[in-house]
UniProtKB/Swiss-Prot annotation:
It comes from Staphylococcus aureus (strain MRSA252). It catalyses: ATP-dependent breakage, passage and rejoining of double-stranded DNA. GO terms for biological process: chromosome segregation; DNA topological change. The keyword Membrane applies. Disulfide bonds: none annotated. Belongs to the type II topoisomerase GyrA/ParC subunit family. ParC type 2 subfamily. Coiled coil: none annotated. It is found in: Cell membrane. The record marks R118 as: Transition state stabilizer. It is a peripheral membrane protein. This is DNA topoisomerase 4 subunit A.
Amino acid sequence: MSEIIQDLSLEDVLGDRFGRYSKYIIQERALPDVRDGLKPVQRRILYAMYSSGNTHDKNFRKSAKTVGDVIGQYHPHGDFSVYEAMVRLSQDWKLRHVLIEMHGNNGSIDNDPPAAMRYTEAKLSLLAEELLRDINKETVSFISNYDDTTLEPMVLPSRFPNLLVNGSTGISAGYATDIPPHNLAEVIQATLKYIDNPDITVNQLMKYIKGPDFPTGGIIQGIDGIKKAYESGKGRIIVRSKVEEETLRNGRKQLIITEIPYEVNKSSLVKRIDELRADKKVDGIVEVRDETDRTGLRIAIELKKDVNSESIKNYLYKNSDLQISYNFNMVAISDGRPKLMGIRQIIDSYLNHQIEVVANRTKFELDNAEKRMHIVEGLIKALSILDKVIELIRSSKNKRDAKENLIEVYEFTEEQAEAIVMLQLYRLTNTDIVALEGEHKELEALIKQLRHILDNHDALLNVIKEELNEIKKKFKSERLSLIEAEIEEIKIDKEVMVPSEEVILSMTRHGYIKRTSIRSYNASGVEDIGLKDGDSLLKHQEVNTQDTVLVFTNKGRYLFIPVHKLADIRWKELGQHVSQIVPIEEDEVVINVFNEKDFNTDAFYVFATQNGMIKKSTVPLFKTTRFNKPLIATKVKENDDLISVMRFEKDQLITIITNKGMSLTYNTSELSDTGLRAAGVKSINLKAEDFVVMTEGVSENDTILMATQRGSLKRISFKILQVAKRAQRGITLLKELKKNPHRIVAAHVVTGEHSQYTLYSKSNEEHGLINDIHKSEQYTNGSFIVDTDDFGEVIDMYIS
């Protein structure tokens, strides 16, 4: 035997072989045929059971026998894959109408594996036999099996639209399919209407076929998605569980789930909901129980007293498989190729298949009727000359000679002569003659009817309609899935997602933020906070985990951080830098932080910059749903910095102090509310080379503490300040010196909450009590606190 060696590139060989493989798995494995809705392995299983007599009216047989028949005759693949496909056809949570009845453990909605095939027993369901009905009447084409030892059908007659009724799911090379199951009665009714009017629109079809009907029930939302899928083959719907509310004896409520979305694993759903409870992702759930038994599916979610059950339900819809998106992708094999098909195309392909099936069956029955008619006519003729026929047969040598004599003497045909010589003596009675004549009339009528069906297309369609109506009447069932027109927007109260807990919020001047339990805070004390060298506490306060923190930076931006998203860190430990929560620029500095409980308020923020700009914006403007990046709070011009952010419940006085010792006080009522992207208006009329060092709210019981670069502290009372108008130059608070004049590097309004100050020089920190600093007159430079010759100039001051 000579070898043929081909010189081919690896690229060409791989491309060719993968192309063949792809075509094979598309056509022979993963995608259903539009005509019978079956993949090849499913078709082979059903045909093997039918041809071996494993039908609904017989006893159950071991599944292993069927698997062996399928592998041995039609499907030379692994036994597990065949058994898996067989089991799926018996699972009433996967198929709207099961095609195989199975005794024994056939898996569960919890995705438990079925018992081994040697333990389970199966037989065809009654409805499955409608897929195979008339297969022995030459209704469909047969091809040789894999080893040419027998024949198998290319497609089943499929006397109902199985593709739509039971749906299909599968993945192949370059293609996937997701066709949902539907209600059998609705699908048949839509098919009947399509037969009556082939130009019927999708909208008109949807009067009869409302949408998918999942075996697990559930609630389907989104008629627009259904319509889009029925028109184009692709669409999206929402499927949510059926949830009811019950009240227990102790007054608590519980959510009862009796239906879940299609192909959702029940045990995984229960586990997920319980994880949300255990991880405190949702507050208000006491216990989650799977109470499913033989009476049906039931999941109980017991709630705490006085919780918002609707919000908990909505949270679970959004964060578990209690609600899912189902995406239609109606791809099926049509004319040997995968096609994305709308519902009209699917029904049309099915109808064309039925026309062919009924026509082939009618031809088969007509041929048999005509053959029988021919025999009956021969028998009637023979009985009319019975004595002569008997005499001729008795004088013949054998059966063959008798047949030849009948053909030659009385002009019977070969078939008629065969029937005559095979006729038994007891049939030669008057009763039998009458019966033959009656049969002859019936055959005449049948042949006439069959020819009419073949010659008249409308008559053929009427046959299809009658048989579909019979199946509808016999197998119809109520719809399981409820359809709602609109997709409901899920609204979740924050109280449901986050357990309410009072905690301590802290922010350092270097940007380290954390939340700490009250217990940890009380066990340590304020002074024991974890800090890096050179850092200090900017603010700390008691907040709730359901609150929101707004962190403002010198760039005029703010970070929106829900308190519950902050790391829970002990008071003595270092916090988390804000840049790890929301990315900020390297030179961006935190200047203030505020806590918001409710953005629906009349409160407002005031923003002041170093170059003397000021702006007022209401709190509700700062509410957002974006947590992942900094947001604009105010526009800060080039070469300027935001130095102060204040929050007020109502209009009040603010004081501005500049580096050269100027001060201006006016009411925030002079500021108009502006948007977040506005830069604001002029706050104070600055001298040349002067800049703002402080803008803070002030009241008549407050004092102001100022620090100069020369190490001096000056404290003045509110009465020195003069209330004026915005954008004026203000009053002078320092005595001007010709040589080495004092310049204010920091200033703060001192309220009853403040008792200490900290002065920072280049190489030293100086701490002291604010009350030790006596109040000064307007035109003084205060008292020297730091020796700048030893420690350098003062650069900053904080109060606490």
